[in-house]
Amino acid sequence: MKKNFVNLKGNKLEIRWIGELVKKSEPVIVFLHEGLGCVDLWRDFPATLYKTLKIPSLLYSRQGYGRSSPSKVPKSLDFMHKEALEILPRLLDALEIERAVLFGHSDGASISLINCGGLQDKRIKGLVLLAPHVFVEDISISSIQKAKLEFEKGNLREKLMKYHFSNVDCAFWGWAGAWLDEDFLKWNIEEYLAGINIPVLLIQGEDDQYGTLAQVTAIQNGIGINCTSEIISGCAHSPHLEKPEATLNLVKEFIKGLKF
């Protein structure tokens, strides 16, 4: 397992490879973290998946997260579009990745949808989406408001500091500030769904505190037959951490069935 950094237009992004990319033509699973995530917060799920599939994986922390360069706050409300349509393609170029499966969680899953539907990048062969959002719901805002209170009054800041270091404030406020902005209520990425014509696996916890099953229905309807949806009972917003075995089995079978 190698830790490293890549420079993109003067900004340093933390990356970590699990497994070795021997040939450029080999497929890579690219992990895109949630709104408060980073390389370290994927825990051991990527390594466990690698042991099962033997497909190299790339984890990276977006700017303002983990050990990456800091970012300015407040973020522009199209921050996920910029990540999807500008930063992610640049990262794949810089690392000479020719075939990839995007594995996104929450904001990372939404970024994956925008990237795939907006660019139809031939390098992307499949999407694994955990708890994606395509529009804003009351439950999302309510849970983020609770997180804001915990960050300001509780110990959430201290917990996140262990993973985001000096980025802890720009990581939190970049995320919460955007999602709680009144103008963000209009955020909607359903227009990108019709442009997705590769296989998609969508996994959501039945008890997800950040989104309802309306997200799943919208994505399934928007993408159509290329999308397979799985709802995991007794699970909230992080299936890979809360129900790792069930999630691993679903992901393993899906990726084994892809044509690279």
How does the language model describe each region?
Residues 59-99:
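Active-site loop/oxyanion-hole signature of alpha/beta-hydrolase fold enzymes
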Residues 98-137:
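Conserved hydrolase catalytic core segment
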Residues 198, 212-221:
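Short alpha-helix in the alpha/beta-hydrolase fold that links the catalytic acid
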Residues 235-244, 248:
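Catalytic histidine-centered segment of alpha/beta-hydrolase-like enzymes
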Residues 18-70:
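Conserved HGGG/HGGXW glycine-rich cap/lid loop of the alpha/beta-hydrolase fold
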Residues 196, 202-204:
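Short beta-strand/loop motif that positions the catalytic acidic residue
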Residues 207-211:
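Acidic catalytic loop of the alpha/beta-hydrolase fold
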Residues 221-238:
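Catalytic histidine neighborhood in serine/cysteine hydrolases
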